[in-house]
């Protein structure tokens, strides 16, 4: 359940960030509102980056070697296209 919540939090943060970018690109915000939106965007970006880093660290390929499992970092180059 915690994984689903984390995924939803990431998805919501990303959606919020995209909405902020659109508002900033429209140029209809005052300077103060733009700065507030920018600050919120920086926080959301950090949250998203943190979630991605955690996910990357969790994604590992398990290989059986000599009867023991060893962990290797995930390499996205191995994925079929």
From Swiss-Prot:
Pfam families, A to Z: Exonuc_VII_S
Catalytic activity line of the entry: Exonucleolytic cleavage in either 5'- to 3'- or 3'- to 5'-direction to yield nucleoside 5'-phosphates
Biological process annotations from GO: DNA catabolic process
Main localisation: cytoplasm
The entry's keywords: Cytoplasm, Exonuclease, Hydrolase, Nuclease
One MF term in the entry's GO annotations: exodeoxyribonuclease VII activity
Gene Ontology cellular component list: cytosol; exodeoxyribonuclease VII complex
Record's function text: Bidirectionally degrades single-stranded DNA into large acid-insoluble oligonucleotides, which are then degraded further into small acid-soluble oligonucleotides.
The protein's name in its UniProt record: Exodeoxyribonuclease 7 small subunit
Organism whose genome encodes this protein: Pseudomonas syringae pv. syringae (strain B728a)
Gene responsible for this protein: xseB
């Amino acid at each position: 359940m915690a994984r689903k919540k984390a995924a939803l939090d990431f998805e919501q943060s990303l959606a919020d960030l995209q909405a902020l970018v659109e508002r900033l690109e429209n140029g209809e915000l005052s300077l103060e509102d733009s700065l507030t939106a920018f600050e919120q965007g920086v926080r959301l970006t950090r949250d998203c980056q943190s979630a991605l880093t955690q996910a990357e660290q969790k994604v590992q390929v398990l290989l059986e070697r000599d009867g023991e499992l060893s962990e290797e970092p995930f390499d996205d180059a191995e994925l079929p296209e």
